């Protein structure tokens, strides 16, 4: 039988795990009790900083399989041939809530993917919506503060939340999605995923094309009403996590169809909307979806903390054949995500097994807290050197990216104030019953927000479509004419 006797961290057997050392049966605890001190000290440090956003999450391993040839667009090895399979890890999450938040709350859902390719890890850090509230990362900390707890009373504040959202009219597209029936997915298995940002593909000829990534659930879309969600939360705050775990355990593996949209650099220069604006989508009629592969989740983690809580996703992690774009929000995340992981997990978080590349890597980074991989041994710690170590690969350079204009703090609202056309298009695509749910969900979510904030939201909705603003005003029980007065 395997030896499962209790030991201290250094391997020393523990003689007594029931009673502390004391001076006499009623006497004080002895500081010399090594197991008591070790056990308490480790307990005091068990909790690492939680993610500032996406704190409550669930994860699973799986496989990405290529079903369609896209090698004319990208030289990324993950897409190199039809039938190729790549191991991956996916973490789903709610966004605004803390670790103890309920899974079935009305919120955006995170959909973060890590592909363990032979060229390195590719992290596609997405959500279940194709857009976001913001197009400038300078306002991301403000969004966080608005949707988190109020600094005075430590309670969530509809007033703070909606005050911020309604003062940024470009947020209306995301707000409309969040307040729609899709604002509460029935489970992680029954929602779509999106890379959301614009990225770039680079092919064998080093030609660039812009790309957006989509994952369409093959289980079908299923959502919850507010009332259904409230009933579930009353009984099970881990409903989405339980559904994902149990479905994989019984062999009912969830799948998503992996698709892309493509836009040439010339098309981007001349298109009527800014293709790098995260508050807008690329219309499918102009840039149709193209099938690429299938993502299947088929293995649960063995330990939640080690594999889900310590997983770290960073959009900076790309592979050859995939690149970035002028998307401002993407560029902000390129810094912020890695910086947050270094704070949360340490500078060597890539050595944690769930984050570690499956291919050889030689990153030149040395030392730092919790360095456990040999630290590159006696290899030289500088470059250039005379010993052929740490050489770069100039043949891997991307083509030059054209930029336009002078460096300045440009106010994008001065040359792009089209905040309402796409939310209006989305509203008009909804059948009447979904529009009514949108009105009612919005009214409940606004709760006790001040009247002038509700009126401001009605004005924003009315600009997207008069029926949208009218319906929200009626659901809120406020006078439409008064609300429309600027």
Curated annotation (Swiss-Prot):
<dbReference type="InterPro" id="IPR002226">
    <property type="entry name" value="Catalase_haem_BS"/>
</dbReference>
<keyword id="KW-0575">Peroxidase</keyword>
<dbReference type="InterPro" id="IPR040333">
    <property type="entry name" value="Catalase_3"/>
</dbReference>
<dbReference type="InterPro" id="IPR011614">
    <property type="entry name" value="Catalase_core"/>
</dbReference>
<dbReference type="InterPro" id="IPR010582">
    <property type="entry name" value="Catalase_immune_responsive"/>
</dbReference>
<keyword id="KW-0560">Oxidoreductase</keyword>
<dbReference type="GO" id="GO:0042542">
    <property type="term" value="P:response to hydrogen peroxide"/>
</dbReference>
<feature type="binding site" description="axial binding residue">
    <location>
        <position position="337"/>
    </location>
    <ligand>
        <name>heme</name>
    </ligand>
</feature>
<dbReference type="InterPro" id="IPR024708">
    <property type="entry name" value="Catalase_AS"/>
</dbReference>
<protein>
    <recommendedName>
        <fullName>Catalase</fullName>
        <ecNumber>1.11.1.6</ecNumber>
    </recommendedName>
</protein>
<comment type="subunit">
    <text>Homodimer.</text>
</comment>
<feature type="region of interest" description="Disordered">
    <location>
        <begin position="1"/>
        <end position="28"/>
    </location>
</feature>
<dbReference type="Pfam" id="PF06628">
    <property type="entry name" value="Catalase-rel"/>
</dbReference>
<keyword id="KW-0408">Iron</keyword>
<feature type="active site">
    <location>
        <position position="127"/>
    </location>
</feature>
<dbReference type="InterPro" id="IPR018028">
    <property type="entry name" value="Catalase"/>
</dbReference>
<dbReference type="GO" id="GO:0004096">
    <property type="term" value="F:catalase activity"/>
</dbReference>
<feature type="active site">
    <location>
        <position position="54"/>
    </location>
</feature>
<comment type="function">
    <text>Decomposes hydrogen peroxide into water and oxygen; serves to protect cells from the toxic effects of hydrogen peroxide. May be involved in aerotolerance of B.fragilis.</text>
</comment>
<keyword id="KW-0479">Metal-binding</keyword>
<keyword id="KW-0349">Heme</keyword>
<dbReference type="GO" id="GO:0042744">
    <property type="term" value="P:hydrogen peroxide catabolic process"/>
</dbReference>
<dbReference type="GO" id="GO:0046872">
    <property type="term" value="F:metal ion binding"/>
</dbReference>
<dbReference type="InterPro" id="IPR020835">
    <property type="entry name" value="Catalase_sf"/>
</dbReference>
<dbReference type="GO" id="GO:0005737">
    <property type="term" value="C:cytoplasm"/>
</dbReference>
<keyword id="KW-0376">Hydrogen peroxide</keyword>
<dbReference type="GO" id="GO:0020037">
    <property type="term" value="F:heme binding"/>
</dbReference>
<comment type="similarity">
    <text>Belongs to the catalase family.</text>
</comment>
<dbReference type="Pfam" id="PF00199">
    <property type="entry name" value="Catalase"/>
</dbReference>
<dbReference type="InterPro" id="IPR024711">
    <property type="entry name" value="Catalase_clade1/3"/>
</dbReference>
């Amino acid at each position: 039988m395997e030896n499962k006797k209790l030991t201290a961290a250094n391997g020393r057997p523990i003689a007594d795990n029931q009673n502390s050392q004391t001076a006499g049966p009623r006497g004080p605890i002895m500081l010399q009790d090594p197991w008591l001190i070790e056990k308490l000290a480790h307990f005091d440090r068990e909790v690492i900083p939680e993610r500032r956003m996406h704190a409550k999450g669930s994860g699973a391993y799986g496989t990405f399989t290529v079903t369609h040839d896209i090698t004319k667009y990208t030289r990324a090895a993950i897409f190199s041939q039809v039938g190729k399979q790549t191991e991956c890890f996916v973490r789903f999450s709610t966004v605004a809530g803390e670790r103890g938040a309920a899974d079935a709350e009305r919120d955006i859902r995170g959909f973060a993917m890590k592909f363990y390719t032979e060229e390195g890890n590719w992290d596609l850090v997405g959500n279940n919506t194709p857009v976001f509230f913001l197009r400038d990362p300078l306002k991301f900390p403000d969004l966080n503060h608005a949707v988190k707890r109020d600094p005075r009373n430590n309670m969530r504040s509809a007033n703070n939340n909606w005050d911020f959202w309604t003062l940024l009219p470009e947020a209306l597209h995301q707000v409309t999605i969040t307040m729609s029936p899709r604002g509460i997915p029935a489970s992680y298995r029954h929602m779509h995923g999106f890379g959301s940002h614009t990225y770039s593909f680079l092919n064998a000829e080093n030609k660039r094309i812009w790309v957006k990534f989509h994952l369409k659930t093959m289980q079908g879309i299923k959502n919850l009403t507010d009332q259904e969600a409230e009933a579930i939360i009353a009984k099970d705050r881990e409903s989405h996590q339980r559904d994902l775990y149990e479905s994989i355990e019984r062999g009912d593996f969830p799948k998503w169809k992996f698709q892309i949209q493509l836009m040439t650099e010339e098309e981007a220069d001349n298109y009527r909307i800014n293709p790098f604006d995260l508050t807008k989508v690329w219309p499918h009629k102009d840039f149709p979806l193209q099938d690429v592969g299938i993502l299947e989740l088929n293995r649960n983690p063995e330990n939640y903390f080690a594999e889900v809580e310590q997983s770290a996703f960073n959009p900076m992690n790309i592979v050859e054949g995939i690149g970035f774009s002028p998307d401002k929000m993407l560029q902000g995340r390129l810094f912020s995500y890695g910086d947050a992981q270094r704070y949360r997990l340490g500078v060597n978080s890539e050595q944690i097994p769930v984050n570690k590349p499956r291919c050889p890597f030689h990153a030149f980074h040395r030392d730092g807290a919790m360095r456990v991989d040999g630290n590159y041994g006696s290899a030289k710690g500088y470059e250039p050197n005379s010993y052929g170590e740490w050489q770069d690969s100039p043949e891997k350079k991307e083509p030059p990216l054209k930029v336009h204009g002078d460096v300045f703090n440009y106010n994008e609202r001065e040359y792009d104030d089209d905040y309402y056309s796409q939310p209006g298009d989305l509203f008009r695509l909804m059948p009447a019953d979904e529009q009514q749910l949108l009105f009612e969900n919005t009214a409940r979510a606004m709760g006790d927000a001040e009247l002038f904030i509700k009126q401001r939201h009605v004005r924003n909705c009315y600009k997207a479509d008069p029926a949208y603003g009218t319906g929200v005003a009626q659901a809120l029980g406020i006078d439409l004419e008064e609300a429309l007065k600027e």
